[in-house]
């Protein structure tokens, strides 16, 4: 449970394990339930296109998301995958939503073992493919 008293649903954990271990999903978007007491799955996708994942993030509301990010390693060393956690808190979301999502994030992050990188986005440029790739490159020493 988080500082805000929000719990992580069993469904949310199962979906993450299906992404991480079973490669059943490419992405998961999480939200708070209507009562703001539990983090639940908003949607899952098997779509490989990163742009399709970003388009699923709401313009005016907060979400958490996990994406199985695939990228090229330099000099022909092949492809790698890193599970990326997103805290999506657009500038246009209500202050209350931003506060509840910020105070509830740690509960979800602690429950999701195997996250490689964390991204905080307030607008779409911060979650663009190149921005995320740059952050992954810095944390893995690719550049």
From Swiss-Prot:
Its main location: cytoplasm. SMART domains: ADF. Pfam families: Cofilin_ADF. Gene3D superfamilies: Severin. Residues 5-137 form the ADF-H domain. Belongs to the actin-binding proteins ADF family. This is Cofilin. The gene is COF1.
